[in-house]
Amino acid sequence: MVYKTLFALCILTAGWRVQSLPTSAPLSVSLPTNIVPPTTIWTSSPQNTDADTASPSNGTHNNSVLPVTASAPTSLLPKNISIESREEEITSPGSNWEGTNTDPSPSGFSSTSGGVHLTTTLEEHSSGTPEAGVAATLSQSAAEPPTLISPQAPASSPSSLSTSPPEVFSASVTTNHSSTVTSTQPTGAPTAPESPTEESSSDHTPTSHATAEPVPQEKTPPTTVSGKVMCELIDMETTTTFPRVIMQEVEHALSSGSIAAITVTVIAVVLLVFGVAAYLKIRHSSYGRLLDDHDYGSWGNYNNPLYDDS
């Protein structure tokens, strides 16, 4: 029985430690390739399996440090981040367009060490509704100017999880295949500015915005206080509140009438005791032993020195 108890305690302790430790594994971004016409979902190229570094597009906002990694699997995981775009109309079956952004914005992605080419392809299914599958190919070319990836990268920190609605983080993705972790800037509205110079055959310029899906993650337990500190706090609270509680209980238990009745009863008992004692003493001192001693068979009491028969 003792061994079973120790084993159960070890299991509970290990589980508590695992839950208390923050998850340090980076989030893997895997996105579907087929979408509905009003939405476009971006997937990273299978050739790029290394972790991309996220560098802030606006240098004044360096508040938090979050890892952003892109992986090649196309299957959806519980920790997926899907990027939806606004309603767009694409007329050509296959069109290639590049967007360059010269105005740095905190909600856009601008590569710092290389250009990012964005190719767009269209796929049609048997149902007749065209669905756009967009494959983002990352290539290093230092000679080209920085290219804009219009969708934002919603990143969520695994260690800091709040109960408030998830914020959308905008970060800049570089293509130098390094694992340097930089900060991201939270933006309140998930909107991205349109690229000033965009060449596309569609009537409307596709403006994409990123929405972060709630990622099911384990919540870190609240800060635990040691048992000794808890015991000391409880002892302090009990010692300070104990006399007050007793006084309140006494006040509630004994009303003014009860206190008066108890006082009168005690006084009456004391008076009765003293009265009986005084009565017995007076009686004994008055008669002495005249009524008790009849040694000589007469009314005289010769043993009493106060009584003189002569």
Curated annotation (Swiss-Prot):
Renumbered residue ranges of the record's region Disordered: 40-225
Name of the protein in its database record: Prostate androgen-regulated mucin-like protein 1
Main location: membrane
Primary role: May regulate TLP1 expression and telomerase activity, thus enabling certain prostatic cells to resist apoptosis.
Compositionally biased residues, Low complexity: 104-115, 150-209
Post-translational modification: Highly N-glycosylated and O-glycosylated.
Residues that span the membrane, as ranges: 259-279
Topological domains, Extracellular: 21-258
Name of the gene encoding the protein in the UniProt record: PARM1
Domain of life the protein comes from: Eukaryota
Organism per entry: Homo sapiens
